[in-house]
C-alpha cells in the first residue's frame, strides 16, 4: 500500500484516492538441496561419520512496494552454491567420552541487478560476488569422576577466508585498487564445565568459556546453572541461571559493502533466568510437559543494522539495551487409538527489548522505545495427527506489531501490523526395499493473509509446495 493513486475531476481537483492492487511477478526461485550421511559403528565404542550438504539456489528478489518501475525492465537476482562437509569420530568408554569433528564449508554467492537501458539491452548496475571458505575443527570430552560429578571440556577453531566484491565498483586505498574486501580471521572458543548432583533432587553446574576473534580475546566468560526437583509427582522442577555474554562483530558487520562499520564494538552483558517445568504421563496413553521462564538481559553496545541517510543499511552500536520477558512452552503427545496419534506443541513469548542507552543527537527519539523489527508478543501452535504412515500437520503463528523506526512512530511506513499465519501439510510415507520414501504437500498461508516481515517487501499470499523425500537404507 505504498502507491497511492489520485482521482481528479474536470478541473484537476483531487476528489478521491485509492491504493491499486498490484501483482509482484519478480519472486520466482529454484532450489536444490542434497544431504548425504554415512556412519560406521565398530561395535567397540567407536563411531565414524561423514556428512555432506549441498545447496544450489537461484532466486529473484521481489520488487519493493515503493518501486513504481516496470518489473519487466529490470532483473534483481541472487544465486548461491554452498557445500558443507563434516568428518566425525566419537569414542565412548564406561566413564568417559571423546568426540572430534573436522569440516570444510564453501559458499559462492552472487547478486546481480540489471536495468533496461531503453532498447531491450540490460545493463549491469550491480555485480556482487562473494566467496567464503571456512575450515574448522572441534574436540569435546566428558569424564565422570563419580556418579555425581561430571567434567566436560571443548575446543573449537574456525578459519574464515572471505572475499566480497562488486565488479562494477573499484575503490582506492592509497595507490592500490581494492574491489570489495578480502579478509581472513581465526576464531577460537574453549569451554570447561563441572556438573555436580550432590543429592537426587539438586543439580548445579559451572561453565567457563573464552573466545578469540582475530587478535581480540574475550575475558573469561562464566555461567552458573542450578535446578531443583520440587516434587517428584509431576516432575516439577525449578531452574535458574546467570550468564555473562560476549559477541564480537562478524566480518559482514565490519566490512560488508556498502554499509560495513569497522568501528563497531563487541557486545557484552549479563543474562538472568529462572523458571519452572513439569512432565506427567501414562505409558502408551499420553505425555504432557511444559515450562515457563522469566529472563532479564542487559546488553552493552548491542549491534543492530539500521537504514542510514545514504539509503542503505549499516550496523551500529546501541549503548545499552534491556531485554526481558516471559517465555512458555507446552507439549502433548496422545495415543487416540491403536494406530492414531496426536501431538501438539505450543509456545508464547512476551519479550520487550528497550533502548536504554544515550541519545545520538538532540533529535534522537529512540530512548525507552522497542528495538526495530522485534515483536513484543509472539506465539506458535502446531498439531500433528498421524495414522499409520499418514500424517496431517497444522502450524499457526502470531507476531505482534513491529516498528521499523527507532522512534516507534505509527506512521504508514513506521510500523508493520500484527499478523496470523496458518500452514497445513499432508504427508504419506512409503517403506521400500532400498529406501524410505515420503511424499508431502503443503499449503502455506492457508487463509491468504496479507503481511510484511520487512518494510515494503510483501510476503506471498496462499502458495503451494510439494516435496519428495528419499532416505536410502
Residue ranges of predicted features:
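Flexible loop and strand-edge segments within Gram-negative outer membrane beta-barrel domains
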Residues: 2-10, 21-33, 39-98, 106-132
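C-terminal beta-signal and adjacent terminal beta-strands/loops
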Residues: 2-4, 300, 344, 398-407, ...
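Outer-membrane beta-barrel transmembrane domain signature of Gram-negative proteins
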Residues: 77-86, 91-92, 104, 112-205, ...
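Gram-negative outer-membrane beta-barrel transporters
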Residues: 197-201, 293-298, 317-406
Amino acid at each position: 500500500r505504498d502507491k497511492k493513486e489520485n482521482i481528479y475531476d474536470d478541473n484537476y481537483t483531487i476528489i478521491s484516492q485509492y491504493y491499486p492492487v498490484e501483482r509482484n511477478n519478480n519472486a520466482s526461485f529454484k532450489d536444490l538441496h542434497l544431504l548425504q550421511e554415512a556412519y560406521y559403528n565398530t561395535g567397540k565404542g567407536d563411531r565414524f561419520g561423514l556428512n555432506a550438504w549441498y545447496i544450489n539456489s537461484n532466486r529473484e528478489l521481489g520488487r519493493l512496494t515503493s518501486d513504481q518501475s516496470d518489473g519487466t525492465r529490470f532483473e534483481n537476482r541472487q544465486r548461491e552454491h554452498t557445500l558443507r562437509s563434516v568428518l566425525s569420530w566419537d569414542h565412548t568408554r564406561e566413564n568417559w567420552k571423546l568426540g572430534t569433528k573436522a569440516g570444510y564449508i564453501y559458499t559462492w554467492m552472487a547478486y546481480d541487478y540489471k536495468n533496461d537501458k531503453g532498447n531491450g539491452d540490460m545493463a549491469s548496475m550491480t555485480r556482487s560476488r562473494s566467496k567464503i571458505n571456512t575450515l574448522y575443527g572441534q574436540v569435546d570430552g566428558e569424564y565422570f569422576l563419580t556418579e555425581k560429578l561430571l567434567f566436560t571440556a571443548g575446543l573449537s577453531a574456525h578459519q574464515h577466508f572471505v572475499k566480497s566484491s562488486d565488479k562494477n565498483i573499484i575503490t582506492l586505498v592509497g595507490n592500490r585498487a581494492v574491489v570489495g574486501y578480502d579478509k581472513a580471521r581465526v576464531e577460537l572458543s574453549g569451554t570447561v564445565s563441572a556438573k555436580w548432583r550432590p543429592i537426587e533432587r539438586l543439580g548445579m553446574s559451572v561453565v567457563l568459556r573464552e573466545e578469540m576473534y582475530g587478535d581480540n580475546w574475550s575475558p573469561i566468560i562464566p555461567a552458573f546453572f542450578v535446578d531443583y526437583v520440587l516434587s517428584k509427582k509431576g516432575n516439577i522442577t525449578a531452574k535458574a541461571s546467570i550468564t555473562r555474554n560476549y559477541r564480537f562483530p562478524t566480518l559482514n558487520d565490519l566490512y560488508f559493502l556498502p554499509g560495513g562499520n569497522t568501528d563497531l564494538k563487541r557486545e557484552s552483558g549479563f543474562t538472568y533466568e529462572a523458571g519452572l517445568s513439569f512432565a506427567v504421563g501414562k505409558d502408551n496413553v499420553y505425555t504432557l510437559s511444559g515450562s515457563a521462564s522469566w529472563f532479564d538481559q542487559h546488553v552493552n553496545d548491542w549491534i543492530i543494522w539500521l537504514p542510514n541517510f545514504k539509503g542503505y543499511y549499516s550496523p551500529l552500536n546501541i549503548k545499552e539495551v534491556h531485554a526481558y520477558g516471559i517465555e512458555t512452552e507446552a507439549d502433548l503427545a496422545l495415543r487416540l487409538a491403536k494406530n492414531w496419534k496426536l501431538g501438539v506443541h505450543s509456545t508464547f513469548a512476551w519479550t520487550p527489548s528497550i533502548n536504554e542507552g544515550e541519545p545520538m543527537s538532540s533529535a534522537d527519539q529512540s530512548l525507552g522505545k522497542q528495538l526495530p523489527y522485534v515483536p513484543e508478543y509472539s506465539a506458535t501452535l502446531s498439531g500433528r495427527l498421524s495414522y499409520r504412515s499418514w500424517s496431517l500437520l497444522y502450524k499457526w503463528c502470531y507476531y505482534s506489531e513491529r516498528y521499523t523506526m527507532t522512534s516507534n512512530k505509527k506512521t504508514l511506513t513506521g510500523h508493520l501490523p500484527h499478523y496470523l499465519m496458518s500452514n497445513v501439510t499432508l504427508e504419506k510415507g512409503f517403506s521400500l526395499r532400498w529406501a524410505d520414501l515420503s511424499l508431502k504437500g503443503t499449503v502455506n498461508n492457508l487463509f491468504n493473509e496479507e503481511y510484511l516481515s520487512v518494510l515494503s517487501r510483501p510476503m506471498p499470499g496462499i502458495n503451494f509446495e510439494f516435496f519428495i523425500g528419499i532416505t536410502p537404507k
